[in-house]
């Protein structure tokens, strides 16, 4: 029994990789239950399965309904906001709203929504700006917190957030890789900051991590993406290794697929960089997440 308890605030459990499917081809057997088992063993108590568009949000909810530890989000990722305009925008928003409103208890956040100016090839800036702001209607009506995404778009993100902050009960900016100043501005809006492997790549990232009060931090894996690579500045602080194979084998992690069990490695980096006791920090991160996303517990 692990002495730690975690809530993975961002996990893409609907990704076909956890079913053994890569680029549409079945490469190995479905091992989702093994993946969950490894995570539970190291102390993951709740999994927040992210919704990236309407269909993905439906799939995330459907999966969340199969396990008492699973919860989900409902929203549209900035790179997929073009879907609003491919359909009837008001109807698309209404369907997202109905999905969240009718499944409270399993749906714990609105998102993933925000801005991503690193990947404008998937969705132009104006479309992202318009439909990020539009999704505050979901948060306002459901009274659910937001699961937020901000990539290379801090000024515009902050502008929209300030204008609409009173329309949402709170939220977390996940997979944070911004500056100390950006983090401080988000904390001034009483938002939380989520860290995963993508947040721990450089020494500058680690300095940002040190600057954030522990009562404003959350932890995530964003698996199967955002694993900690050996080239990442944070990797030197990892103490826990998992049996890993380059080619899939039952009972082992797979080399290039991040898993929720790796959340222990994120904690090890965070606690070492911040010079904090790992157990104390884990408890703080857990309590922060309960406060925002599971207030009824």
Curated annotation (Swiss-Prot):
Manner of cofactor binding, per the entry note: Binds 2 divalent metal cations per subunit.
EC number assigned by the record: 3.1.21.-
InterPro entries reported in the protein's UniProt record: DNase_TatD-rel_CS, Metal_Hydrolase, TatD-like, TatD-type_Hydrolase
Cofactor: a divalent metal cation
One Pfam family this sequence matches: TatD_DNase
Keywords for this protein: Hydrolase, Metal-binding, Nuclease, Nucleus
Residues reported to bind a divalent metal cation 2: 112, 149, 174
Subcellular localization(s) per the UniProt record: Nucleus
GO molecular function, one term: 3'-5'-DNA exonuclease activity
Modified residues (N6-succinyllysine): 27, 46
Residues that coordinate or bind a divalent metal cation 1: 112, 222
Domain of life: Eukaryota
PANTHER family, alphabetized: DEOXYRIBONUCLEASE TATDN1 (PTHR10060:SF15), TATD FAMILY DEOXYRIBONUCLEASE (PTHR10060)
Protein name (record): Deoxyribonuclease TATDN1
């Amino acid at each position: 029994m692990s002495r730690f308890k975690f809530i993975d605030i961002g996990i893409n459990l609907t990704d076909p990789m956890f079913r053994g499917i890569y680029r549409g081809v079945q490469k190995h057997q479905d091992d989702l239950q093994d993946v969950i088992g490894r995570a539970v063993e190291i102390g993951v108590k709740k999994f927040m399965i992210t919704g990236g568009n309407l269909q993905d949000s439906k799939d995330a909810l459907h999966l969340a309904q199969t396990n008492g530890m699973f919860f989900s989000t409902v929203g549209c990722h900035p790179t997929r906001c073009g879907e609003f305009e491919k359909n009837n925008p008001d109807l698309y928003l209404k369907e997202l709203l109905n999905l969240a409103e009718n499944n409270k208890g399993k749906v714990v956040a609105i998102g993933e929504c925000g801005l991503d100016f690193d990947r404008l090839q998937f969705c132009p800036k104006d479309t992202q700006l318009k439909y990020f702001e539009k999704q505050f209607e979901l948060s306002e009506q459901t009274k659910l917190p937001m699961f937020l995404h901000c990539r290379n778009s801090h000024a515009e993100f902050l502008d929209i957030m300030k204008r609409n902050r009173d329309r949402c009960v709170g939220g977390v900016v996940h997979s944070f890789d911004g500056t100390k100043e950006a983090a401080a501005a988000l904390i001034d809006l009483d938002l939380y900051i989520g860290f995963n492997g993508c947040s721990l790549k450089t020494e500058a990232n680690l300095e940002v991590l040190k600057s954030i009060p522990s009562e404003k931090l959350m932890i995530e894996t964003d698996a199967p993406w955002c694993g900690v690579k050996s080239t990442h500045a944070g990797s030197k602080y990892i103490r826990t290794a998992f049996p890993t194979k380059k080619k899939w084998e039952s009972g082992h992690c797979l080399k290039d697929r991040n898993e929720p069990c790796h959340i222990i490695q994120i904690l090890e980096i965070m606690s070492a960089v911040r010079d904090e006791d790992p157990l104390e920090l884990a408890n703080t991160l857990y309590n922060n997440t309960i406060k925002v996303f599971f207030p009824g517990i």
